């Protein structure tokens, strides 16, 4: 199997000067030029924001963009002091998971998929939007539709990937809504672990105890968690398999 999930133009390399105002990061390129890049990840990015760390950015030539550069990856050291590249663009997670679904890499858990739709309204008030709504193939024994919520996961402690890394009211609401879909539908929470050094996944109780409680309640009700791990490179991302819960 070709484990390259996505390929793209080689990213531009530099070092992080600072991240500020949540959405912005100043980066010094190899040429010596300093540019400001958009940071799509507005969270605290625990364990990642080391000034002077190697980073990678993409460039857009769209005239509609205020900032042509987007911060995509940062290099950190794992527990063995080896370099690990981490994908920090939260908007990229859904692209990865859509590719994973389309390649049938989750079929042993969710079955064969007939159709994939994105951003479909759901919930009691229909004011929320699910990341992916899937219909099963007619050959599937389980005929239930599948709702998938995706969470970008970058925080690691002791080789355990953790989400969230801060209190997330939105994430709590998503767990409640996923639980309410059971048993009529299949509820799936995909943890998109955008680094290769995770061996397990667990909810980030230290950052958000309520989220951890809701996660376990939803799990007991039948929600399916799928921690998907990836390896990030300068011009592609590789599939690194599904990690167990801790």
Swiss-Prot record:
Recorded superkingdom: Bacteria
Pfam family name, one: SfsA
Single GO MF annotation: DNA binding
Gene3D superfamilies assigned: 2.40.50.580, 3.40.1350.60
InterPro entries for the chain: SfsA (IPR005224), SfsA_C (IPR040452), SfsA_N (IPR041465)
Family: Belongs to the SfsA family.
Designated name of the protein: Sugar fermentation stimulation protein homolog
The species this protein was found in: Prochlorococcus marinus (strain MIT 9215)
């Amino acid at each position: 199997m070709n484990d390259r999930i996505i390929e793209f133009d080689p990213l531009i390399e530099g070092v992080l000067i600072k991240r500020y105002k949540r959405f912005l990061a100043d980066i010094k390129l190899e040429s010596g030029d300093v540019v400001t890049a958009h940071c799509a990840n507005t969270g605290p990015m625990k364990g990642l924001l080391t000034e002077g760390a190697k980073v990678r950015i993409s460039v857009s030539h769209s005239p509609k963009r205020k900032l042509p550069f987007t911060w995509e990856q940062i290099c950190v050291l794992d527990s063995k002091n080896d370099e690990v590249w981490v994908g920090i663009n939260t908007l990229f997670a859904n692209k990865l998971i859509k590719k994973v679904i389309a390649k049938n890499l989750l079929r042993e858990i969710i079955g064969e998929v007939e159709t994939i739709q994105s951003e479909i309204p759901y919930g009691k008030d229909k004011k929320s939007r699910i990341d992916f709504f899937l219909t099963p193939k007619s050959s599937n024994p389980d005929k239930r539709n599948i709702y998938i919520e995706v969470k970008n996961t970058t925080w690691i402690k002791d080789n355990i990937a953790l989400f969230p890394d801060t209190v997330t009211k939105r994430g709590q609401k998503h767990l409640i809504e996923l639980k309410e879909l059971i048993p009529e539908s299949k509820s799936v929470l995909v943890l998109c672990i955008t680094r290769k050094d995770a061996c397990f996944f667990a909810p980030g109780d230290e950052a958000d105890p309520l989220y951890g409680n809701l996660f376990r309640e939803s799990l007991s009700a039948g929600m399916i968690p799928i921690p998907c791990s990836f390896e990030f490179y300068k011009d592609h991302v590789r599939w690194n398999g599904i990690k167990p819960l801790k």
